[in-house]
Amino acid sequence: DLTAAFNPSGEDAKAVLPLLLNALYLLANSGKNLELIKCVFELRLLCVLGFSPVLDECASCGNVDALPFFSPQAGGAVCRSCSAPDACIITENTLDAMRYAKEASDKKAFSFTLPPSAIDAFARCTEKMCEAELSRHLSSLSYLKQMTGKL
């Protein structure tokens, strides 16, 4: 549903297909945490389509010291001073995982684990960013949350 909502074409579609196939393979065969696979897929899809979040400095002011929030409106991690109403609280562990998922090679992007609380924070960030870029809520996300008990 997410891939179709972004409707990639041309070169974007060529880059999205291997990402989608890899994620589907992992969902079906790997035994990895399904929520983490979804998070990594969402983040990498955003990057492929040109919506790459800023994760190494404050997306608003450029501060590199502490980035305890993620703001889809600002376009990535933000410092305490630039925190906006849409911002999610994130830990350094979650931010490091997001950086890794964004920068790693296709073969390595899904090859890490996180504690459940960090996965939940990662999911909040990627879901909000996808919705911000699409300017709408995905009904399939609500269904998935209902099925997994995360509503």
Language model features by range: what are they?
Residues 1-151:
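Non-catalytic alpha-helical scaffolds and adjoining flexible linkers that form interface surfaces
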